[in-house]
From Swiss-Prot:
Entry binding sites for ATP: 242-249
Organism: Chlamydia trachomatis serovar D (strain ATCC VR-885 / DSM 19411 / UW-3/Cx)
Entry protein name: V-type ATP synthase alpha chain
Catalytic activity: ATP + H2O + 4 H(+)(in) = ADP + phosphate + 5 H(+)(out)
Pfam families: ATP-synt_ab, ATP-synt_ab_N, ATP-synt_ab_Xtn, ATP-synt_VA_C
A GO molecular-function descriptor: proton-transporting ATP synthase activity, rotational mechanism
Gene giving rise to this polypeptide: atpA
GO BP annotations, alphabetical order: proton motive force-driven plasma membrane ATP synthesis; proton transmembrane transport
């Protein structure tokens, strides 16, 4: 039998429709409450999604084969919650926060009705006591800390405790398991409370204590096209829509490896199973370029593949953001990668159809936009009571059918995010990786980033705008060349076209398989961008289009070689010197 609270409300199945059950209830229940359905000597986890009189509709998170009319249903009395505490990092969970490595020990395939603790109860943690007897604390205040990898994991007063608590007893510093009572307290009403290292929080409610503040720190990801053309601030939101095969998942894998954040929560809610396996095989062997440790030391993975029931997709995306919010409350910078929010939206559409709700555009529920907005609004930078700041940056991959950016999920996402990184099938087919199309992408953070970088790089904002103008003009001239040929345009237009192509090939594109070019530090980007602007501001003298193309191809080859050399090495400095000499040989004037 499953563990439930003292409330023992029960019911029985009246009707089953896929994973949606209609249940007659004998007692009090509430929407969002967890229920367990009896089938074949096991219990399947479910959630109440609609209450009508003495009947409720529940969505079951697992395969419902074998459920019959009259099957017993038990209601737990608590909402769908995440278990939060030390030990989540390096964890690999399913959408219900079961540890997959533990389930793998019991069976090759996931058995339905098997649930395990998200946090290991046997692991011993070195606990350092911070609170003192007599101190008055409230939700989110620190009781003590444990060392989780390189992070000081704060053991906090549970966020479900909305009253002030006077501490009456604290444990001494030492080695304890997570279920050890580390402090006791008394509320103003006289209620006695005991605190362990673990707390629970409903995943569909925002997890926040503190003041939301404007984002003011750049999130360096090592991709020049993102850091320069479509920058994102820590605490910002952005999306990566693109058709099948455009490189959304590869882009998200790059972000999880190289983004300058403390912790990455990777939520694979609808990825193909093979891509999830690739993550699990690669990440333990990859090194974090910022710390030199394994990438798994800063990563938490929620794997919910397309082959799992649709209801679990919704729980997995909310579970991921709840874990991310929990670590943000410790003053850490978090990146949540959701791949893909379209699969979540499809799950909403399927459940909405079974509930017989009035459909919206393309049969998605009418509340789709508000659900997506509520999800992205849980991101942001937060200032805690102790003055520390944490941030949660959200990146959602969107998979529009046929690459149609006008479909409802993409449009609902674009209305709430701060940056749009549109992936193009045409660029992917042309092997222009990363296949982010700078012509359709945008960022609301450009001016903020320019303001931050103004002291270090004067005129950064204007330089980025100039580069964008060259890309736009070059694209227009390229279309004319396809019609009338190179002989039908002026030499000045030919020069603009070749400069835009040079910028695209040598700056916006990167080689993910090159040890140096796969990750470009910000200082290196600034130097390379300075070189590109020097080329933009220079006028050259050519006799004919062929000579111009030959010169820019030679220049492109040398800059590409430079990108593959170790930054500030002797070879790098020599290569840079050769490039500037080559420019001087053809330069007429500098603007």
């Amino acid at each position: 039998m499953v563990a439930t609270s003292k409330q023992t409300t029960q019911g029985y199945v009246v009707e089953a429709y896929g994973n949606l059950l209609r249940v007659h209830v004998d007692g009090h229940v509430r929407q969002g409450e967890v229920a367990y359905v009896s089938v074949d000597d096991t219990w399947l986890k479910a959630e109440i999604i609609e209450v009508v009189g003495d009947e409720v509709k529940i969505q079951v998170f697992e395969e419902t084969q074998g459920i019959s009319r009259g099957a017993l249903v038990t209601f737990s009395g608590h909402l769908l919650e995440a278990e939060l505490g030390p030990g989540l990092l390096q964890g690999i969970f399913d959408g219900l926060q079961n540890r997959l490595e533990i389930l793998a020990d019991t069976s090759l395939f996931l058995r339905r009705g098997e649930y395990v603790n998200a946090i290991c109860r046997e692991t011993v943690w070195a606990y350092t006591q911070k609170a003192s007897v007599g101190s008055v604390l409230s939700r989110g205040d620190v009781l003590g800390t444990v060392k989780e990898g390189r992070f000081d994991h704060k053991i906090m007063v549970p966020f479900s405790c909305f009253e002030e608590v006077t501490i009456t007893w604290v444990i001494s510093s030492g080695n304890y398991t997570v279920d050890t009572v580390v402090a006791k307290g008394r509320t103003s009403t006289g209620e006695e409370l005991e605190f362990t290292m673990v707390q629970k929080w409903p995943i569909k409610q925002a997890f926040l204590e503190g003041e939301k503040v404007p984002s003011h720190e750049i999130m360096d990801v090592g991709l020049r096209v993102l850091d320069t053309q479509i920058p994102v601030l820590k605490g910002g939101t952005f999306c990566t829509p693109g058709p099948f095969g455009a490189g959304k998942t590869v882009l998200q894998h790059h972000l999880s490896k190289y983004a300058a954040v403390d912790i990455v929560v990777l939520c694979a809610c609808g990825e193909r199973a093979g891509e999830v396996v690739e993550i699990l095989q690669e990440f333990p062997h990859l090194t974090d370029p910022h710390t030199g440790q394994s990438l798994m030391h800063r990563t938490c993975i929620i794997c919910n593949t397309s082959s799992m029931p649709v209801a679990a997709r919704e729980s997995s995306i909310y579970l991921g953001i709840t874990i991310a919010e929990y670590y943000r409350q410790m003053g850490l910078h978090i990146l949540l990668l959701a791949d893909s929010t379209s699969r979540w939206a499809q799950a909403l559409r399927e459940i909405s159809g079974r509930l017989e709700e009035i459909p919206g555009e393309e049969a998605f529920p009418a509340y789709l936009a508000s659900r997506i907005a509520a999800f992205y609004e849980r991101g942001g930078a937060v200032k805690m009571k102790d003055g520390s700041e944490g941030s949660l940056t959200i990146c959602g991959a969107v998979s529009p059918a046929g690459g149609n950016f006008e479909e409802p999920v993409t449009q609902a996402t674009l209305s709430v995010v701060g940056a749009f990184c549109g992936l193009s099938k045409a660029r992917a087919d042309a092997r222009r990786y990363p296949s982010i199309d700078p012509m359709i992408s945008w960022s609301k953070y450009l001016d903020s980033v320019a303001e931050i970088l103004e002291k270090k790089v004067p005129g950064w904002g204007e330089s980025v705008k100039q580069a964008s103008r060259f890309l736009e003009e070059g694209a227009e001239i390229g279309k004319r060349i396809e019609v009338v040929g190179e002989e039908g345009i002026s030499m000045e237009d030919m020069e603009i076209f070749l400069k835009s192509e040079l910028y695209d090939f040598c700056y916006l594109q990167q080689n993910a398989f090159d040890a140096e070019d796969c990750y470009c530090p910000f200082d290196r980007q600034i130097e390379l961008f300075s070189l590109m602007n020097h080329i933009f501001n220079s006028r050259f003298c050519f006799d004919c289009p062929d000579n111009a193309r030959s010169f820019f191809l030679e220049l492109q080859s040398k800059i590409k070689t430079l990108n593959g050399q170790k930054f500030l090495s002797e070879e790098y400095q020599k290569g840079l010197e050769v490039i500037y000499k080559l420019l001087e040989s053809k330069m007429v004037q500098t603007v």
